[in-house]
Swiss-Prot record:
The modification O-(pantetheine 4'-phosphoryl)serine is found at residue 1753. It comes from Aspergillus niger. Residues 388-821 form the Ketosynthase family 3 (KS3) domain. This is Non-reducing polyketide synthase adaA. The active site is at residues 561, 696, 739, 1348, 1540. The gene is adaA. Residues 1316-1629 form the PKS/mFAS DH domain. It catalyses: holo-[ACP] + 9 malonyl-CoA + acetyl-CoA + 9 H(+) = 3-(2,4-dioxopentyl)-3,6,8,9-tetrahydroxy-1-oxo-1,2,3,4-tetrahydroanthracene-2-carboxyl-[ACP] + 9 CO2 + 10 CoA + 2 H2O. PROSITE patterns: CARRIER, KS3_1, KS3_2, PKS_MFAS_DH. Its cofactor is pantetheine 4'-phosphate. Its EC number is 2.3.1.-.
Amino acid sequence: MSAPTKLVFFGNEFPNDDLKALFRGLHRHGKDRRFRQLATFLEESTRVLQNEVAQLPEPLKKLVPHFENLMPLTEVDFRQGPLGAAMESALLTILELGMFIGHYEAEERVWDLSADRATLAGLSIGLLAAAGVALSTHLAEVVQNGAECVRVSFRLGVYVHDISRKLEAPQADGSLLSWAHVVTGETASDLQEELSRYNTETGTPELLKVFISAADKTSVSVSGPPSRIRAAFRASQRLRYSKSLALPVYDGLCHAAHLYDEETIHRVLHPDGSVIPTSRPVQLALLSSRSGQPFEATTAAELFRAISTELLTGTIFLDNITAGILDRTERCADATQCQIETYRTSLVFKGLLKALEACFPDRTISTTDLIPWVFQDYGARQPKSCADSKLAIVGMACRMPGGANDLDLFWELLAQGRDTHTTVPADRFDLETHYDPTGETENATRTPFGNFIDQPGLFDAGFFNMSPREAEQTDPMHRLALVTAYEALEMAGIVSGRTPSSNPKRIATFYGQASDDWRELNASQNIGTYAVPGGERAFANGRINYFFKFGGPSFNLDTACSSGLAAVQAACSALWAGEADTVLAGGLNIITDPDNYAGLGNGHFLSRTGQCKVWDQSADGYCRADGVGSVVIKRLEDAEADNDNILAVVLSAATNHSAEAISITHPHAGAQKENYTQVLHQAAVNPLDISYVELHGTGTQAGDAQEAESVLDIFAPRNHRRRADQPLHLGAVKSNIGHGEAAAGIASLLKVLLMYQKNEIPAHIGIPTVINPAIPTDLEQRKVYLPRTKTAWPRAAGQIRRAIVNSFGAHGGNTTLVLEDAPEKQVTVAREERSTHPVVISAKSKKSLAANVETLLAYLDENPETDLGDLSYTTCARRMHHSWRLATAVSDIPALQKFLRNAVSNDAVSQTRPIPTEAPPVVFTFTGQGAYYAGLAQGLFQALPFFRAEVRQLDHLSQRLGFPSIVPVILGEVEEGTATALVTQLSIVIVEIALARLWLLLLGIPAPHAVIGHSLGEYAALAVAGVLSTADALYLVGHRAQLIEEHCTPGSHAMLSVRATIADIERLVGTGSDAPTYELSCQNTHQDTVIGGSIQDLNAIREKLEHEGIKCVNVDVPFAFHTAQMDAVRERLAKAVAAVPFKTPSVPVLSPLLGSVVFDGKSINPEYIVRATREPVQFATAIDAAQELGIVNSQTLWVDIGPHPICASFVRSLVPGARIVSSCRRNEDNFATMAKSLCTLHLAGRTPSWAEYFRPDEQAYSLLRLPKYRWNEVNYWIQYLGTWTLDKAHLKNGGSQKRAITDVPSISSLRTSLIHQVTEETVDKTTATLKAISDIQHPDFLEAVHGHTMNNCGVATSSIWTDMAMTVGEHLYRRLVPGTDHVLMDLCDFEVQHAQVANTNSNTPQPLALEAHLDLPTRHMSLAWYDVNATTNQRADAPFATGSIKYPADPTGAAWSIEWSRITHLIQGRIEALQHLAAENKASTLSKPLAYALFKNVVDYAPRYRGMDRVVIHDHEAFSDITLTTDRHGTWHTPPHWIDSVSHLAGLVMNGSDASNTRDFFYVTPGCSSCRMAEPLIAGGKYRNYVRMFPMPDEAHMYAGDLYILREDKIIGVVEQLKFRRVPRLLMDRFFSPNKNAAAHAAPAPAPAAVPAVKKQPPTETIQPQAPKTEQKQDQLQLPNLASAAPSTASSSSSPSSSGVATPTTEQEAPGADASAVTGVAGKCLELIANETGLGVAELTADATFVQLGVDSLMSLVLSEKLRSEMGLEIKSSLFLECPTVGDLTGWLEQYC
């Protein structure tokens, strides 16, 4: 049969369909990967138009709305403007080509247009669309070529309008006039004669003439400027009385040869801007509308030029087109069919079709409309990218006002039409003192109303691993975010890592929060350790990510009132961008701060009369509300693949801003409408298809009016009325629960999601009086309703409900979501019905476990028809599992109810214990041949594809080795007892290997911790352990079986299992010559022995033993394995096994042959296999050996791998308390066995991979909405006390200021920038003593300290103490030796014990003392620096820094110069070597900015300290060039910034060199052994220094080096043994932070700083904490003391804590020592830990981990400080990591303290 001819006809008019609907359809299908070519074409066309618009003049550009897709262009009527021709031409081209491409993809049609059979034709602009096809050889080329067609059509349209408007200006009123009329009943020649006459008589210029633009036999189209056409029809009698009709041509003249020329056309086309190669060849015939013949163009450039020339200058002759088509059709004489494709129909097309039918009556002529496919539904969208996905909301949770603490209560509240507003409760603030309706009280609220969550402080701290102290300080918003996040995830069935979309690295959180009441008010009353992580907004999300271990983005957003919905929109954007696969989003608001009430009231936001009255005449502002809500969102395709319950689908979401509003807080209807239009375009949804809008609806006059305007104009426009069956319902949840501010949007979203579930719209209760007169009065006519009663919202069959959710921010933001119904679930997978199902329940506390059991029981009592399989699937595969567990395997719901009732009534929960923190090890034990039976593992084979595939793959290998298939055995097709030894043994080993791999899958582990195989089972064990390949194991099993069958007689020998030791058997059977003979075959336990021998001998033995009361059982095997009967195969087996490779086991092998544990790769070899066949199985000895080595113990889990658990009893006998599970059991359904085994493993702490267990039939199961987790809640609440938010309004400047102790007169003339007051100075003939007081807060001293900052704190450098030492040293020396010119000094043995950190309160003195004693005969002066108590003026007993000054005997310094000159060349040599290394790029050269940028890793120097101009550094060696500042900046001996500049190179070497581990550590100097300067440093002086640091061999983590200072290549100073100690970076805060207590300020530090050395306390049984002495300075940098000591014991009952927070009821929930029984140091430590964390001592059980107790790194530092300061114990904070449990810590304390 010959191929048909094809005609594709492209018209020049839009179809009569709704243009927006057509483009919406294209846009919607373009998001589906089944329409990839269509999507690409739409994207390319959009890009082309964007580029063309961008090149337009500015006035024209402004006429085009911003567009990211084509939808906004369809919303604008361009015809009245200058872009009418351009846009209509481009959109028609896009529409026709888009429909063509989409039709091909929808029909999955292959390209079937050939050059000899296909013809293309078109009219006017339709020719350009046709050109896109004419240039193509396949569909993808149509996409590329089509974009160029769009470009050309747009440019031609712009040009036509530009020229035409120069011929005649548009109408002033904007009305449209036609540029073409069609005249019927006239011939072209007659009409041309009449037009020529008219044009001549009227003197019409050629340019403006009326002319013929198209013609056929019966009609003629007349074109020209509109006024000229009207004049012609009035003036010409022939025209006036002709039959004519104005055509819808409003944009200018085409087909006008007198108007356009080819040169202009070429310039307009601008071929250099083509988006395709202009040389692309023409592939298909495209007929000219003038000649009816194919265009003669051969390339794309020629074709577009020809078409454009014809469009602008050529006359259309419809008759020629028809003739050309008939001619092309006639050429295919052999064709019997003619297929025509077009876009709807037209008069022209009807005429063409009639002509074809008349000319070819024998041909079958069929027509295809290319439009209808766009309205078809092709099933669930298959998005081509994340950006095209619909999104699925799969989980939600909330805490809302009015007691709506869960979704059911929230819906109940809405359904009942309740109003939840009340007066402010007492737990927020005292309304009596903070409410003043008159407004006269500053900072008071003018309204007493709000909507509040009941007890928002309730929280299960233990569940979230938080201590009570941390929970108390954590914002309740953050806590409830955690709680609702968990509940939403639980509802969604999210289990981390279960599916690709639940990969924790790809889960993100987005929450909206707009206030910080708790941090600013409640927690700030007593700022504690957790003030920052507990109150800063970022931690709301961060805590969720951290707790659940989510690695995706974490964003906390503030967009004022729209924060919650904006967070949802941001979350959706992350999904569309592919940044995450699952998101948690929500909004948070808990009101406690009256300041915000005052601010909002004064800003006229709040209603003074009560609730939000949305759209009511009396609306007077909003009523504030609490609210916390969370939703879980995924891409729709992921949710469907994951078998999730889909609550609703998000089609689009967007946020914009009301930039044009009259004020920043005033809403703007225009911006709101723009946002609606944007989301509707994104979703490709008709606004009339929206059936519900959840209003933002604050109940303000301005807000209600603006939102009413925007909603009604877009969703119920007057110019496009809704039908009666298209009602639009409106509502606002704020009428019920008030305005939740940051949580308002999420509350609205939750309401709509519940409406989808309940198929009902709650009553709108926001109009207590009459509707606001600002609202349009024609709502009913526009089919818009505010339901005053509950209204049904059913989902009609095959229909989809769509809704809008609005949320607007007071700052001007507008957020809108478009929702639709979830797709109807189609269950296409048949479920394998399992006889028994596991059901598991878990919790994180005993109390919650009991409550969870009770709620599940209540659920089943209310829903007795619950499907057990669905329940099992939900509790096992779709729940997060916790440490307290119950599990059972049941066959029906009544059995489960019985189990749960027993658990409740028998208090089974109290007898449970939490699973261990580490999963117990698993050992696989493989049974031997005695476990065989027909149909082994049949149920698993039939139901589990993974197991079935493994068996079939192993069976395939076995068959390729030449052995028979064992599948018939599994399927029970082989009768019991008829299988050969070969089939029997292969069946067992194949099933065991497959079972092992199934268990590895179900347990989620790569390998067992050890394996042991019994007899035949050892082959499977060796294969699993990697000793043998699977193929080699099967080969050996099969070959050995063949040898046994060939060389051993079945039935001649047997095996007997005896319940006795081998010694008992020997004693009872005897050993004489007449005694029956036997051999030991297996020693299974110490009391279970298997012997083998001939049938006769074993029968005799059995008779004897049973006579003695010994139990005996015949082993059901045809041969006596492990006896002399096997000798017949040994030699042959040895030959077979010789070529088999053996490898080192990947896991320990418990060898029953060797009676030991095998780790090496040599013990198991070919000889081993032969011996194992002949020699006895020492199963008991192997287990004993494993126990002795600690490979197995009572905690080990044993999995019996085999058809029947024969080895289970052996293991139980050998390992007391052993827990062993079975794979299969004879005469028991496989899934009954498997379910029970999985439950056992689950309860033991080895959680199975439940997802894999249910994966085969997962789509056939349903996720049930079970009761939510029952929390063990305690009300953690810090009550706002007093009236300080009011009082602060009345504070005035002023107040007393303490007088600094340094302000009293000094008894000496000595006073410098660092020495402020000399309190004692005594001088005699040979000695002098000086005592001085200095204040760090003195401006000069403080400026010097702040020149050296660490951890953002000013820290005193060594140079400060050096200047003080030199100042006092020179002063006292001159007192004893008057007239001395220059005093040389050597600062020796200088050591700083503690850092001195400047307090932040500069108004409070921070004194220190310096004491010096000079002894002239010894030329020695001692120095000591002390802390001073600013309150008592008492100095500390011990100094924080010490040193001495030595005065050289030679006051000229000549001896120093001689000494240094001897080594100068060495120093210069090292400097030159460093320069050489730098030239070779082996050493680093650092500029000043780079050097001090590196220094910032530890210390930040002020500009005056930055003397180093250049540094060359290599490892721990360096030199630098230095220029000192010219200004001394104070009164000094030597300015500290000069001293530091010439010496801090050593600090840079240690803290900036790549040879140091600066990521984990920083390095600080405790001092030096000597510091000498032979000459004074000079202002602006240039110096060079050199240093090399070495590790000190006698002191760990300590470095030292000599630093040399040179001027003009001469050494002028040396710092000897300059030391640096390595300190963990995490202690930076601990050592370098200002003390909170100004009276107990921090101690000084050298540059960069000194840290206290670790001091070891001698072990002692009891160390009593000592109360600090008021007259002494306590150890530096300790935490502030508590007001009172902790009680000696903690109460276990619920009682208020020191902050008014109830302590949770404690339970003895785990085995271990009772903390209250721990005494001595350990007991006191536990009391301190309990006090600091807020826990009860009874909760510190031995197996409780510090992670579970909420002891994080921050708390660890606090505890270590407390233990040191209060008990004198030097304990590092990392001890809580090294001792992870309370028991570990108490053991360490008892041993070392």
